[in-house]
Amino acid sequence: EAAIYVVLMDDALALDLGAEIYGSVPDVYINADGFKKSIPSPGIGNYVTMAKAMATARSLVGDDGLRKRSYVHAHGTGTPQNRVTESEIMDELAKTFGIKSWPVAAVKAYLGHTLAPAAGDQLTSALGTWKYGFIPGIATIDHLADDVHASHLTIGSDHIERSADSLDV
């Protein structure tokens, strides 16, 4: 197992303290049924949640920022059901938002599937990508499965190196 520790604070407090700022959380979205606030199965909630986050990103960095200076972290564990539903959601929303080739990273290829800190694994990896411009490839694949939706996604085992200032989201 693993542990992730992230300190979140108000913008003014961070500036007053002279804290190094790695990113910001402009909003949080969830759309799930039941008592456990996670997505229990494929459905419209997945699309709604991700579309809201993408719309927020677009409102902050503009259409070009979202279309040309963003990437996405896949969360699905590589199981047939997850790879199909997750790739379908990402691909369809990339198309909807006018993204032609959205780079996809999946940190689980390097860390495995941690339980509680899985979101923290992805958060810290994303912060590193924004700082250094290095989008990790998915090292555990040598080709895409036939059932992966990828007409608007760039999914591969090769790392993508970009200048750090070329990534907004």
Regions found by a protein language model. Name each.
Residues 22, 47-51, 69, 86-91, ...:
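A general structural signal for well-ordered alpha-helical packing
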Residues 34-46, 76-93, 114-122, 154:
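Short glycine/threonine-rich loop-to-helix capping motif typified by GTGT followed
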Residues 49-62, 89, 93, 122, ...:
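Stable alpha-helical structural segments in soluble proteins, enriched in small hydrophobic residues
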Residues 1-65, 70-71:
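Condensing-enzyme catalytic core mediating Claisen C-C bond formation in acyl metabolism
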Residues 20-28, 63-74, 101-109, 137-147, ...:
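Beta-strand segments within the central parallel beta-sheet cores of soluble alpha/beta enzyme folds
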Residues 1-13, 116-169:
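Conserved beta-strand-centric core segments of catalytic alpha/beta enzyme folds
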Residues 55-59, 74, 78, 95, ...:
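Short helix-capping and hinge/turn segments at secondary-structure transitions, especially at repeat
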